[in-house]
A protein has these predicted regions:
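Small/aliphatic-rich secondary-structure junction motif
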Residues: 1-45, 58, 127-179, 200-202, ...
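Short, surface-exposed alpha-helical segments at coil->helix boundaries
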Residues: 17, 43-51, 187, 191-195
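General small-molecule cofactor/ligand-binding pocket signal
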Residues: 32-34, 63-67, 116, 157-159, ...
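Short, hinge-like loop/turn segments at secondary-structure boundaries
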Residues: 49-51, 134, 174-177, 227-228, ...
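Charged docking surfaces used in two-component/phosphorelay signaling
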Residues: 66-74, 213-219
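Gly/Ser-rich helix-loop-strand patches that form or flank binding pockets
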Residues: 76-124, 223-273
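A short acidic, glycine-rich active-site loop
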Residues: 178-189
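A short, acidic, amphipathic alpha-helical segment used as a generic capping/interface helix at domain edges
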Residues: 193-198, 215-226
């Protein structure tokens, strides 16, 4: 896996570097680090961040680049130069990015590259919350998450949230949380998708469970992270409309970042390998 860690020169953020180490170690990945100095900024600050990165990534042989200019242009140039599978950035940086850069849908047209936004990063990833929209016949999200979980040695909870009221096909079930087994035995597209998802996880020797909720998706995702001790939340790029920049700025991703004090991985279409 080829990983790009995105840093800025204003302040050294350790979580992206820590997460880069965790994933690179598990996947035998290659790490590049891009330190961006804004126009009018001090290049020596960027060099100081770069030196700290090299110390923290000792043993991983990272390539560290310090560049000055507009963040958007520098990131695009680097992503055009190399075929990365994963970009890691800190949420503090994303919030500043959101305030300072107008969304340009043509900036990055595809949603191929996975994006990992770090906060409250733990030294190990043991438990992953995988949020699925149950897209019929599309198991790419589960396949990608399963492969990563296998490399990390992590367990996976597969969560699906029915927006609003419980679907009419399940009317009469008093507590949807308590009837997962019953729902999985039906022939509905949701049940078929989740059953296949569990099979994929089992095929990869991943310890797993399925949880089903009803309500506002973001609220149910937040609630789940509050009652269980997860280390990483995973969503699909289909939850965001346009490319990597939209992953950074898209409404759902921003809501999740703002509400969940955990690293969030948005999985793109390019294989994490």
């Amino acid at each position: 896996m080829k990983i790009l860690i995105y840093m800025d020169s204003e302040k050294y953020h350790h979580p992206p570097v820590m997460m880069g180490k965790i994933i690179a170690k598990a996947t035998d990945g290659e790490i590049n680090v891009l330190v961006v100095v804004p126009k009018g900024g001090h290049p020596e600050n960027g060099e100081a961040v770069a030196e700290q990165v090299k110390l923290d990534l000792e043993g991983y042989s990272p390539k560290v680049f310090v560049k000055q200019g507009k963040s958007r242009e520098i990131i695009k140039e680097e992503l055009d130069r190399e075929e990365y599978q994963l970009v890691i950035a800190d949420t503090d940086r994303i919030n500043r990015f959101k305030k300072s850069i107008e969304v340009d849908p043509m900036f990055i047209k595809q949603s191929a590259i996975s994006l990992l936004l770090t906060q409250q990063t733990k030294p190990r990833i043991n438990k992953i919350l995988l949020c699925t929209g149950c897209k019929e016949d599309d198991y790419s999200l589960i396949n990608q998450a399963s492969a990563l979980a296998g490399d990390l040695g992590a367990a996976v909870t597969l969560l699906h949230v029915f927006p609003g009221a419980v679907p009419s096909m399940y009317t009469g079930l008093e507590q949807i949380e308590e009837t997962v087994d019953e729902m999985l035995q039906t022939d509905t597209p949701f049940a078929q998708y989740l059953r296949r998802g569990v099979e994929i996880l089992k095929e990869n020797n991943i310890a797993s469970e399925v949880k089903i909720r009803r309500g506002i998706p973001i609220e149910e995702i937040v609630r789940e992270t509050q009652v269980e001790n997860y280390d990483l939340v995973v969503i699909g790029s289909s939850m965001v409309d346009k490319g990597l920049l939209e992953m950074l700025l898209g409404n759902l991703a921003v809501k999740i970042i703002n509400r969940i004090e955990l690293p969030v991985l948005v999985i793109g279409t390019r294989t994490l390998a």
